């Protein structure tokens, strides 16, 4: 680490790939010119503020496979140009999604077996790693459920297990074996949500789907349909809760991540949508972010025009606005991040 820090500081390192560690205080850059942030939804505005202190004005490219509503994009990324890739790569097919309850279990098991017999592989995602006696419900746990599948349901199939408590080397070995076709079924937690590319896997089964958010389910669905074969996502839930049924119904009706994110916004609101990772969003008393798209567009245009005329809001006529912004974002030393 010491050598890398020295190389970044003196400019002898041209390209550095890393995690949030690149934003810590002890990391200094000689001439930071370009920052590419992958999985941007996993970074908060705090990280963006930290990055702004590393260089005067580096070029920035942020990428995210988890769409956010365009209404919120205008607020969170108002200083960036937003480009959308909303088409499937050539050769890929739409993933068909079904929400079913436990009464479909036997049919589902038969469907899993047929897919494996045809040479494909299957993801099964559970909400828990291990069973907890303090949680006397019917939530599936990875370890116990995989054992049950091996003993009672698919004793002749190759079943692997993957979860976050495994050592990094173990996880890498399991994923490499699955990608190489050495296992038929991977029973996992949401650790497979991002960064997994197995084109031969064409079936995603999500147990206790009511335990997951819409965006998370959409990400999990994205683990299949990465090859040319027809793919499916099965959402299992016995919940009778109307909000849950509505959420799952959205996924069965569309594969459009932006429509899904808009629905997520309606269901959870902007605060819960981003959680503590994205602070600074005002509590709105009248506006509705899911409906007031035109008004937000006009507000952004007006804000850009104002900042072009008075970038620091130094004009006395803009004093009240400046003070309001300072209070809203708790700005220190009069600087905007």
Question: Can you say where each PLM-predicted feature lies in the sequence?
Answer:
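C-terminal accessory region of SF2 helicases/translocases
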Residues: 232, 240-337
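Inter-lobe coupling/hinge segments of SF2-like helicase ATPases
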Residues: 1-249, 309-312, 337
């Amino acid at each position: 680490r010491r050598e890398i820090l020295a190389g970044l500081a003196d400019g002898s390192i041209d390209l550095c790939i890393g995690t949030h560690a690149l934003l810590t205080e002890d990391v200094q850059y000689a001439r930071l010119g370009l920052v590419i942030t992958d999985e941007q939804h996993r970074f908060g505005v705090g990280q963006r503020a930290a990055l702004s202190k590393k260089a005067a004005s580096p070029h920035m490219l942020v990428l995210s496979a988890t769409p956010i509503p365009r209404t919120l994009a205008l607020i969170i990324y108002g200083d960036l140009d937003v480009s959308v890739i909303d088409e499937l790569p050539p050769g890929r097919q739409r993933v068909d999604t079904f929400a079913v309850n436990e009464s479909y279990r036997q049919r589902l098991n038969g469907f899993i077996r047929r897919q494996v017999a045809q040479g494909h592989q299957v993801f099964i995602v559970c909400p828990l790693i291990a069973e907890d006696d303090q949680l006397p419900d019917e939530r599936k746990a990875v370890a116990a459920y995989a054992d049950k599948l091996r003993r009672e349901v698919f004793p002749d199939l190759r079943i692997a297990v993957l979860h976050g408590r495994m050592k990094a080397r173990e996880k890498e070995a399991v994923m490499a074996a699955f990608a190489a076709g050495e296992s038929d079924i991977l029973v996992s937690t949401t650790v497979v949500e991002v960064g997994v590319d197995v084109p031969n896997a064409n079936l995603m089964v999500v147990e206790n789907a009511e335990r997951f958010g819409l965006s998370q389910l959409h990400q999990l669905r994205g683990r299949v349909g990465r090859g040319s074969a027809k793919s499916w996502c099965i959402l299992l839930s016995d919940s009778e809760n109307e909000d849950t049924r509505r959420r799952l119904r959205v996924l069965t009706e569309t594969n459009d991540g932006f429509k899904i994110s808009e629905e997520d916004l309606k269901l959870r609101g902007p605060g819960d949508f981003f959680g503590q990772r994205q602070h600074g969003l005002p509590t709105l008393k009248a506006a509705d972010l899911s409906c007031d798209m035109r008004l937000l567009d006009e507000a952004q245009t007006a804000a850009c025009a104002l900042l072009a005329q008075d970038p620091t809001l130094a004009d006395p006529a803009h004093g009240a606005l400046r003070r309001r912004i300072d209070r809203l974002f708790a700005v220190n030393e009069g600087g905007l991040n």
